């Protein structure tokens, strides 16, 4: 308890509580901004970033109607890829309803059973191709080495639509057409290519693709079948009138 010596000089007026100041609405608003401005900026920037990513992903990004894989020891020239994507789109439909038909070529560099191949490119290609197959991304495959591809992945189906048994990989020639077997493919205007970042030579794109084959994935599960079904009409259009010669010499 405080002593009388300290209490005797206290003015009773000093014991009255001070009247609390009433701030105006403008002053309260200014104080709120002083304390919270940095948080408003932080959340505003974060929100703008999320909105940008959302808009970019769903409205500004072109989503392909079809994914077609190219598996070969080297990348196709950029000019060939661009021309081929445009020509393939002419035989497809607008599956996602965005008003245009887009075909995307997914290139995977793999040299099956080759000791001279680039190990880094083969590893990268194997990883990407495995992801494609596991996610049922590409339904149609343009192949440089269909025998090596089928032996490694076992994903192709027979040309008549039947699914091969697990020990039928050596029967690969009944699962593909040569590029030159398909009148639709050989009739495409693909132009020529010049040296670029992935190709040191120049030449005709159709001549380059003449050594390739084309096949379609088999679907052993309902989930993969539903993901791959959009590729069926495109496959039928591209192989219309084709007669396979892949088995000649086997």
What are these regions (language model features)?
Residues 94-119:
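Acidic, glycine-anchored loop motifs typical of Ca2+
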Residues 78-100:
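Short, polar/charged alpha-helical segment
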Residues 35-57:
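Hydrophobic membrane-insertion alpha-helices, especially the h-region
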Residues 163-250:
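Extracytoplasmic/periplasmic C-terminal soluble domains
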């Amino acid at each position: 308890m405080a002593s009388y010596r300290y209490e005797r000089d206290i003015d009773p007026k000093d014991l009255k509580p001070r009247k609390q100041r009433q701030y105006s609405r403008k002053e309260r608003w200014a104080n709120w901004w002083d304390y919270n401005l940095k948080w408003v900026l932080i959340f505003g920037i974060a929100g703008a970033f999320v909105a940008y990513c959302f808009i970019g992903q769903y409205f500004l990004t072109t989503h392909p109607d079809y994914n077609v894989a190219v598996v070969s020891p080297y990348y196709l020239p950029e000019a060939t890829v661009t021309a081929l994507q445009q020509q393939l789109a002419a035989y497809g439909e607008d599956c996602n309803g965005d008003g245009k038909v887009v075909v995307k070529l997914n290139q995977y560099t793999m040299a099956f059973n080759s000791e001279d191949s680039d190990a880094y490119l083969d590893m990268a290609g194997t990883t990407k191709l495995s992801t494609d197959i596991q996610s049922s991304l590409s339904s149609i495959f343009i192949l440089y080495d269909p025998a090596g591809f089928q032996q490694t992945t076992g994903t192709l189906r027979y040309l008549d639509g039947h699914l091969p048994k697990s020990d039928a990989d050596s029967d690969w020639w009944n699962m593909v057409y040569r590029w030159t077997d398909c009148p639709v493919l050989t009739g495409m205007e693909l132009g020529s290519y010049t040296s670029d970042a992935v190709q040191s030579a120049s030449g005709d794109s159709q001549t380059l693709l003449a050594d390739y084959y084309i096949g379609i994935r088999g679907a052993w599960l309902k989930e993969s079948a539903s993901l791959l079904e959009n590729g069926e009409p495109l496959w039928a259009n591209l192989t219309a009138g084709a007669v396979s010669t892949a088995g000649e010499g086997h």
